[in-house]
Protein backbone atom coordinates (compact mmCIF):
# COMPACT_ATOMS: atom_id res chain seq x y z
CA UNK A 1 0.00 0.00 0.00
CA UNK A 2 1.31 3.44 -0.93
CA UNK A 3 1.91 5.83 1.97
CA UNK A 4 2.12 9.54 1.15
CA UNK A 5 2.28 10.67 4.77
CA UNK A 6 -0.40 13.37 4.72
CA UNK A 7 -4.11 13.82 3.97
CA UNK A 8 -3.72 12.45 0.42
CA UNK A 9 -3.61 8.98 1.99
CA UNK A 10 -7.23 9.30 3.04
CA UNK A 11 -8.34 11.33 0.02
CA UNK A 12 -6.96 8.77 -2.45
CA UNK A 13 -7.57 5.62 -0.40
CA UNK A 14 -10.16 4.27 -2.85
CA UNK A 15 -7.91 5.03 -5.83
CA UNK A 16 -4.96 3.20 -4.29
CA UNK A 17 -7.15 0.18 -3.58
CA UNK A 18 -8.88 0.28 -6.95
CA UNK A 19 -8.37 -1.88 -10.01
CA UNK A 20 -6.72 0.91 -12.04
CA UNK A 21 -3.92 1.50 -9.53
CA UNK A 22 -3.36 -2.23 -9.04
CA UNK A 23 -2.89 -2.46 -12.82
CA UNK A 24 -0.43 0.46 -12.71
CA UNK A 25 1.52 -1.20 -9.91
CA UNK A 26 1.89 -4.48 -11.81
CA UNK A 27 2.99 -2.58 -14.91
CA UNK A 28 5.60 -0.62 -12.92
CA UNK A 29 6.99 -3.75 -11.25
CA UNK A 30 7.77 -5.13 -14.69
CA UNK A 31 9.04 -1.84 -16.14
CA UNK A 32 11.34 -0.96 -13.23
CA UNK A 33 12.65 -4.56 -13.16
CA UNK A 34 13.53 -4.74 -16.85
CA UNK A 35 14.20 -1.12 -17.90
CA UNK A 36 15.66 2.09 -16.55
CA UNK A 37 12.70 4.26 -15.54
CA UNK A 38 12.31 7.69 -13.99
CA UNK A 39 11.85 9.04 -11.43
CA UNK A 40 13.21 6.76 -8.71
CA UNK A 41 10.39 4.63 -7.37
CA UNK A 42 10.79 6.52 -4.08
CA UNK A 43 10.08 9.86 -5.82
CA UNK A 44 7.02 8.90 -7.90
CA UNK A 45 4.55 10.58 -5.53
CA UNK A 46 6.70 13.55 -4.49
CA UNK A 47 4.16 16.07 -5.80
CA UNK A 48 1.63 14.73 -3.29
CA UNK A 49 4.21 14.37 -0.52
CA UNK A 50 5.39 17.97 -0.80
CA UNK A 51 1.93 19.52 -1.11
CA UNK A 52 -0.88 18.32 1.14
CA UNK A 53 -4.39 18.23 -0.34
CA UNK A 54 -5.62 20.98 1.99
CA UNK A 55 -2.60 23.19 1.30
CA UNK A 56 -2.99 23.31 -2.49
CA UNK A 57 -3.28 26.90 -3.75
CA UNK A 58 -2.33 26.25 -7.36
CA UNK A 59 -1.72 23.31 -9.67
CA UNK A 60 0.88 23.35 -12.45
CA UNK A 61 0.11 20.36 -14.62
CA UNK A 62 2.86 18.78 -16.70
CA UNK A 63 2.77 15.92 -19.18
CA UNK A 64 5.18 13.22 -17.98
CA UNK A 65 8.56 13.19 -16.22
CA UNK A 66 11.82 14.19 -17.84
CA UNK A 67 13.28 11.05 -19.40
CA UNK A 68 17.04 11.60 -19.21
CA UNK A 69 19.28 10.50 -16.36
CA UNK A 70 19.23 12.57 -13.18
CA UNK A 71 16.42 14.92 -14.19
CA UNK A 72 13.04 13.72 -12.87
CA UNK A 73 12.34 13.79 -9.15
CA UNK A 74 8.56 13.69 -9.00
CA UNK A 75 7.69 17.38 -9.45
CA UNK A 76 6.49 18.65 -12.82
CA UNK A 77 9.02 20.82 -14.70
CA UNK A 78 11.50 20.58 -11.78
CA UNK A 79 14.98 19.07 -11.69
CA UNK A 80 17.31 18.58 -8.76
CA UNK A 81 19.95 21.19 -7.97
CA UNK A 82 23.09 20.62 -9.98
CA UNK A 83 21.18 19.30 -13.01
CA UNK A 84 21.17 21.39 -16.18
CA UNK A 85 17.96 23.44 -16.46
CA UNK A 86 15.78 21.95 -19.25
CA UNK A 87 14.55 24.21 -22.09
CA UNK A 88 10.90 24.29 -20.93
CA UNK A 89 11.93 25.40 -17.46
CA UNK A 90 14.27 28.00 -18.94
CA UNK A 91 11.24 29.44 -20.72
CA UNK A 92 9.18 29.31 -17.51
CA UNK A 93 11.93 31.34 -15.84
CA UNK A 94 11.94 33.84 -18.73
CA UNK A 95 8.19 34.35 -18.37
CA UNK A 96 8.57 34.66 -14.59
CA UNK A 97 11.12 37.44 -15.09
CA UNK A 98 8.94 39.20 -17.65
CA UNK A 99 5.86 38.83 -15.45
CA UNK A 100 7.20 39.59 -11.98
CA UNK A 101 10.78 40.75 -12.50
CA UNK A 102 12.24 37.69 -10.76
CA UNK A 103 15.62 36.83 -12.34
CA UNK A 104 16.09 33.25 -13.57
CA UNK A 105 17.34 30.93 -10.83
CA UNK A 106 20.72 29.25 -11.20
CA UNK A 107 19.10 25.86 -10.58
CA UNK A 108 15.92 24.11 -11.68
CA UNK A 109 14.59 22.83 -8.36
CA UNK A 110 11.02 24.00 -7.72
CA UNK A 111 10.61 22.50 -4.25
CA UNK A 112 10.07 25.99 -2.79
CA UNK A 113 6.94 26.34 -4.91
CA UNK A 114 5.67 22.92 -3.84
CA UNK A 115 6.17 23.70 -0.14
CA UNK A 116 4.04 26.83 -0.54
CA UNK A 117 1.05 24.99 -1.96
CA UNK A 118 1.83 24.71 -5.68
CA UNK A 119 1.04 21.13 -6.68
CA UNK A 120 3.58 20.26 -9.38
CA UNK A 121 1.71 17.34 -10.87
CA UNK A 122 2.42 15.44 -14.07
CA UNK A 123 -0.46 13.77 -15.91
CA UNK A 124 1.69 10.62 -16.12
CA UNK A 125 3.97 9.96 -13.14
CA UNK A 126 6.63 7.67 -14.62
CA UNK A 127 8.54 7.19 -17.89
CA UNK A 128 11.02 4.77 -19.43
CA UNK A 129 14.48 6.27 -20.00
CA UNK A 130 14.89 8.18 -23.28
CA UNK A 131 11.29 7.47 -24.34
CA UNK A 132 8.95 10.43 -23.73
CA UNK A 133 5.35 9.47 -22.95
CA UNK A 134 6.24 5.78 -22.87
CA UNK A 135 3.99 5.16 -19.83
CA UNK A 136 1.04 7.22 -21.03
CA UNK A 137 -1.26 4.21 -21.45
CA UNK A 138 -0.59 2.33 -18.21
CA UNK A 139 -3.37 3.98 -16.20
CA UNK A 140 -1.73 7.12 -14.83
CA UNK A 141 -4.03 9.40 -16.83
CA UNK A 142 -7.09 8.04 -15.02
CA UNK A 143 -5.27 8.26 -11.69
CA UNK A 144 -4.37 11.94 -12.16
CA UNK A 145 -7.86 12.66 -13.53
CA UNK A 146 -9.09 11.45 -10.15
CA UNK A 147 -6.69 13.80 -8.37
CA UNK A 148 -8.03 16.75 -10.37
CA UNK A 149 -11.60 15.69 -9.57
CA UNK A 150 -10.77 15.53 -5.85
CA UNK A 151 -9.25 19.01 -5.99
CA UNK A 152 -12.30 20.27 -7.87
CA UNK A 153 -14.39 19.23 -4.85
CA UNK A 154 -12.47 21.57 -2.54
CA UNK A 155 -14.47 24.44 -1.08
CA UNK A 156 -11.40 26.69 -1.04
CA UNK A 157 -10.40 28.26 -4.38
CA UNK A 158 -7.51 26.80 -6.38
CA UNK A 159 -5.73 28.13 -9.47
CA UNK A 160 -5.26 25.49 -12.17
CA UNK A 161 -2.42 26.37 -14.55
CA UNK A 162 -2.76 24.33 -17.73
CA UNK A 163 0.08 24.60 -20.25
CA UNK A 164 -0.34 22.78 -23.56
CA UNK A 165 -2.95 20.45 -25.00
CA UNK A 166 -2.24 17.56 -22.66
CA UNK A 167 -2.83 19.64 -19.55
CA UNK A 168 -5.77 21.50 -21.05
CA UNK A 169 -7.55 18.19 -21.66
CA UNK A 170 -8.12 17.99 -17.90
CA UNK A 171 -10.07 21.26 -17.86
CA UNK A 172 -13.25 19.21 -18.28
CA UNK A 173 -12.87 18.03 -14.67
CA UNK A 174 -12.62 21.56 -13.25
CA UNK A 175 -16.31 22.40 -12.94
CA UNK A 176 -16.48 24.10 -9.55
CA UNK A 177 -16.97 27.85 -10.24
CA UNK A 178 -14.89 28.92 -7.24
CA UNK A 179 -11.70 27.80 -9.00
CA UNK A 180 -9.69 29.79 -11.54
CA UNK A 181 -8.19 28.27 -14.69
CA UNK A 182 -5.21 29.76 -16.53
CA UNK A 183 -4.42 28.07 -19.82
CA UNK A 184 -1.93 28.73 -22.58
CA UNK A 185 0.53 27.07 -24.93
CA UNK A 186 3.19 24.81 -23.46
CA UNK A 187 6.49 26.44 -22.40
CA UNK A 188 8.57 24.11 -24.59
CA UNK A 189 10.71 25.80 -27.28
CA UNK A 190 8.36 24.36 -29.91
CA UNK A 191 5.32 26.24 -28.66
CA UNK A 192 6.28 28.92 -26.13
CA UNK A 193 5.95 31.71 -28.70
CA UNK A 194 2.40 30.60 -29.53
CA UNK A 195 0.89 32.11 -26.39
CA UNK A 196 2.95 31.02 -23.39
CA UNK A 197 5.19 34.08 -23.42
CA UNK A 198 3.17 37.05 -22.27
CA UNK A 199 0.47 34.95 -20.55
CA UNK A 200 1.50 36.24 -17.07
CA UNK A 201 0.46 33.10 -15.16
CA UNK A 202 2.38 33.99 -12.02
CA UNK A 203 0.96 37.47 -11.41
CA UNK A 204 -2.52 36.30 -12.43
CA UNK A 205 -2.32 33.45 -9.93
CA UNK A 206 -1.32 35.78 -7.12
CA UNK A 207 -3.94 38.38 -8.01
CA UNK A 208 -6.63 35.71 -7.81
CA UNK A 209 -5.31 34.25 -4.56
CA UNK A 210 -5.21 37.69 -2.94
CA UNK A 211 -8.76 38.40 -4.13
CA UNK A 212 -9.83 35.16 -2.42
CA UNK A 213 -8.05 36.07 0.83
CA UNK A 214 -5.31 33.49 0.29
CA UNK A 215 -1.59 34.16 0.80
CA UNK A 216 0.05 34.62 -2.63
CA UNK A 217 2.93 32.46 -3.80
CA UNK A 218 6.52 33.67 -3.51
CA UNK A 219 7.67 32.51 -6.95
CA UNK A 220 11.39 32.86 -6.18
CA UNK A 221 13.24 29.54 -6.08
CA UNK A 222 16.55 30.73 -4.64
Model regions: which residues?
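A non-catalytic structural micro-motif
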Residues: 194-196
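A polyanion-binding, active-site-adjacent surface
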Residues: 2, 14-162, 166-169, 174, ...
